[in-house]
Amino acid sequence: MAHETFMYQTRDLKFAIKEWLDMEKLISCDAYKDYYGIDDIDGFLDVSFKICRDVLCPANKDADEPGCKHVGGDTQAVITPDSFKNVYNTVCEAGLGPQFANRSEEGRMPLSWYAPILEMQSGASPAIVMFWCLTAGATTVIQNNASEELKE
């Protein structure tokens, strides 16, 4: 049975990222220096917590019951519950969408910042997050290995 309550403590994550790890060195790299400061992680974690509590976790039941459905025939498709779209749009609008797929894009978040966000999201709704990861993995395979014709 899917859980419907999300409890999480961000204090330890903030400590590990800001005090224990040498994040100043990381965010001084060319890929991040024009986009992030060390205190930006607080906002990302706080927003992620609220989205996990208020949006992802309540959608967790839909992820399990009825869950996704495969539609066969001439058009192969996977149909997701209606709540998936709202969750995905909310997460992306907050700037917390998948960060793994195209690491060459400017403004991407350091993965050491995204990992605890993904951990929170996974705790709030494992099925939804695994669906995203599967999709991101397929996208990465296509980006790195497919012909230009298929990419278009």
Predicted regions and their residues:
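Amphipathic, small/basic residue-rich leader segments at the start of a protein or domain
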Residues: 1-133, 149
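Hydrophobic alpha-helical transmembrane segments of multi-pass small-molecule transporters/permeases
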Residues: 47, 137-140
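Phosphate/diphosphate-binding loops
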Residues: 139-140, 144-152
